[in-house]
Design a protein with these regions (language model features):
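Hydrophobic beta-strand anchors of alpha/beta hydrolase catalytic cores
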Residues: 65-66, 100, 167
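N-terminal targeting signals for export/organelle localization
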Residues: 1-43, 209-210
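A short beta-strand-turn-helix
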Residues: 44-64, 88
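Thiol/disulfide oxidoreductase modules built on the thioredoxin-like
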Residues: 135-192
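Short active-site neighborhood of thiol/selenol oxidoreductases, capturing the structured segment around
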Residues: 57-84
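Short, low-complexity, Pro/Ser/Thr/Gly-rich segments in the mature regions of secreted, periplasmic
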Residues: 195-210
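Structural microenvironment flanking redox-active thiols in thiol-disulfide oxidoreductases
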Residues: 79-139
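Short loop/turn microsegments at loop-to-beta-strand junctions
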Residues: 41-42, 64, 164-165
């Protein structure tokens, strides 16, 4: 997927998808991620595109910047990852203290190879994770994310995955710093990520928050 094609995706399409997701998740019983909430921010049972599990001990001092989606997502996911990329660029050296993660909610179709190509089209620093449907569902619930597989054609087996769309910034103490709707424009997503990091106590490089 070329960057030019990604940029051509419309915000209106993302908004329509988000409105559908909100309608579905509103009746699902899934909670919405909230700033200040303590969660289990582990990725137990998931693997990166090389087949390795994340070293949870290495995450003890890092912020997690987490999004959920899938490679066939038509509009919301590309716009979200553009925002993540812009935030990492704006943070400069501080970005080294952040682990940007993209968790696939379509483990049946998202292969390690396709996931790797997908996230690298936005930023090579983004770590793509996948696992069994059960493991993905468990981690999604920990992060207060809803997703649902909807059959489009029973004969062909085609389906779509509808999911709640947030960019979640989680601090090293596993508290949600901010939950940003993915329908925000990429530049606004980036600005809110940077602002949240610099407001969560001291800035990553030890400077006072601004």
């Amino acid at each position: 997927m070329s960057v030019a094609l990604i940029v051509s995706l419309t915000v209106s399409g993302a908004l329509a998808a988000w409105m559908l997701i909100q309608t579905l998740s509103g009746g699902s019983g899934a909670s919405v991620p909230r700033a200040g909430e303590q969660i289990d921010a582990s990725f137990a049972g998931l693997r990166d595109t090389s087949g390795a599990a994340l070293d949870e001990r290495a995450l003890a001092t890092r912020y997690r910047l987490v999004t959920f989606g899938f490679t066939a997502c038509p509009s919301v996911c590309p716009l979200t990852l553009m925002g993540v990329h812009q935030a990492l660029e704006q943070l400069g050296p501080d970005a080294a203290r952040i682990l940007p993660v993209f968790v696939s909610v379509d483990p049946e179709r998202d292969t390690p190879r396709s996931l790797s190509a997908y996230v690298n089209a936005f930023d090579a620093r983004i770590v793509a994770l996948t696992g069994s449907p059960q493991a993905v569902e468990r981690v999604a619930r920990q992060y207060r994310i809803f997703f649902d597989k909807r059959t489009l054609d029973a004969n062909s087996g085609s389906y779509a995955v509808e999911h709640s769309a947030f960019v979640l910034l989680v601090d090293p103490q596993q508290r949600i710093c901010v939950a940003i709707p993915s329908t925000d424009p990429p530049a606004q997503i980036a600005a809110r990520i940077v602002r949240a990091i610099r407001a969560s106590g001291a800035a990553l490089n030890g400077n006072t928050a601004t």
